[in-house]
């Protein structure tokens, strides 16, 4: 599992809304179904001087051409950058997903060029909202525009201000033996101000969508609200939840 690195206080600071063990961040989907109640999250509080992050070093590299990542996140300080996915190592090559200048950025850099570089036009500034993110990297896909995909609250993101897609069989340092970090962008020494919950990484698995909706980690209830759902597929060698 990931190791917890802290400067002063633990990041396990939220025991559900209101702080009670019976309070939940999310509830099962209305009307039944596979909805999963989530009762815990991790708080990363760079402003408090804690400089917390999670780290993991794989003993062997997994599939670097195909993987999926999913999580719920909540911004606690709009206007600040923070890392979402594992990695963002300190030197080239580097890669990961972050909130950068209030936009969601999916980027990986190697040598002197970007392997992938997607910046959403949508801005992320709401400190009260929980967002569900799914990121898919699949450079084996025959369609260039499908080799890197982002989904927000179940729906595929299609509006980008910057848009560079991976070449065939391109790789990033995500899922390599390089130390993987969540909550710390080493290249700029940026720590996070946010909450994370229900984090998944799938090694060698590119989850798919139906008409732009990905249902592997969530589902819409009868009111059209996106709710968490337990993933039931393969995790691969280096996958985790």
Predicted segments, located by residue:
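Short tryptophan-centered beta-strand motifs in secreted/extracellular beta-sheet-rich domains
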Residues: 71, 128-139, 150
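Extracellular glycan-recognition modules
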Residues: 49-107, 141-144, 209-210
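Extended recognition patches within non-cytosolic domains
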Residues: 2-10, 16-23, 29-40, 47-50, ...
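Extracellular glycan-interaction patches encoded by glycine-rich segments
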Residues: 173-196
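Low-complexity, glycine/proline/serine-rich flexible segments
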Residues: 18-65, 102-103, 110-115, 176-179
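Short hydrophobic/aromatic patches on beta-strands that form ligand-binding or substrate-lining surfaces
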Residues: 69-77, 133-135, 182, 196-200
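Short, aromatic/His-centered strand-loop micro-motif at the edge of beta-sheets
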Residues: 107-132
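Beta-strand-rich interaction surfaces with strong enrichment in secreted/lumenal proteins
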Residues: 56-59, 119-124, 169-171
């Amino acid at each position: 599992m990931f190791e917890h690195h802290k400067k002063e206080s633990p990041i396990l600071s939220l025991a559900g809304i209101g702080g009670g063990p019976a309070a939940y961040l999310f509830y099962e989907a209305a009307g039944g179904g596979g909805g999963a109640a989530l009762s815990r999250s991790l708080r990363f509080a760079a402003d408090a001087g804690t400089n917390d992050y999670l780290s993991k070093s794989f003993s062997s590299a997994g599939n670097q051409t195909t993987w999926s990542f999913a999580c719920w996140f909540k911004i606690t300080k709009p206007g600040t950058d923070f890392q979402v996915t594992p990695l963002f190592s300190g030197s080239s090559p580097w890669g990961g997903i972050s909130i950068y200048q209030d936009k969601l950025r999916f980027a990986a850099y190697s040598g002197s060029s970007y392997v992938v570089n997607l910046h959403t036009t949508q801005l992320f500034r709401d400190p009260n909202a929980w967002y569900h993110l799914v990121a898919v990297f699949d450079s084996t896909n025959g369609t260039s525009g499908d080799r890197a995909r982002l989904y927000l609250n179940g729906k595929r993101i299609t509006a980008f201000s910057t848009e560079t897609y991976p070449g065939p069989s391109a790789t990033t340092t995500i899922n390599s033996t390089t130390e993987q970090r969540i909550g710390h962008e080493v290249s700029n020494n940026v720590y996070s101000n946010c909450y994370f919950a229900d984090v998944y990484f799938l090694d060698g698995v590119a989850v798919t969508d139906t008409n732009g909706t990905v249902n592997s980690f969530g589902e819409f209830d009868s009111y059209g609200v996106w709710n968490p759902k337990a993933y039931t597929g393969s995790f691969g060698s280096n996958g985790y939840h």
